[in-house]
Amino acid sequence: MRFYEMFYGIEEKKMKEYIIPIEDIIVKPELFYAHCDRGNGKNPEILKEHVDRCYHYFEELWEHKNFKAVFENFQKELAPELSDEGIKLFYSLIVNVIIFHDCGKINPRFQSIKMKNTLKKWTAIDCLDGTKHSILSAAIYFDYFYEKIQESLLSKDEKNMIHVFMLVNAYVISRHHGNLSGFEAFLEEFQQNQQLADIF
């Protein structure tokens, strides 16, 4: 059984509605590199290819390691009162962590310095600190889903609960290259850098 078939018990075509295409987040994602050989610009992996590959591995883990049961138990234990819409949004938040985790690699300094990407002339953005990408990825994720939550028909209590899940996921995205320490420091850094998502 495929990941989409397991998810909410609906067929694959409907599940794809919950996955946000990277093209809806980043204009011309084919211009951005995710990885290259030792930062020398050779053999670049395009960001879209990287996201697709990561998602494929997530599907494999979901199927073979029974992630669905883990997340169902997590949701039932921490937020048993969520409506059907709230549950769908909860799972959309989870699935799309994979899609958003490296979106911050659109940082012009990351592209020019780390990736040696010469596909376009990159213009540095002053409020971005060096070549960092993880906190920017978290800000883009937060910005996208905050709007979705606010536009939803969820009750105020459900929105508050979903906001907590969203913030935890943004924290995980921001730390996906390191350890998960310093949540308070993340909140401070995130509040200072939330303006980044508005730029993009």
Feature locations, PLM:
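Accessory nucleic-acid engagement/destabilization modules that flank
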Residues: F3, F7-E11, Y18, E23-F200
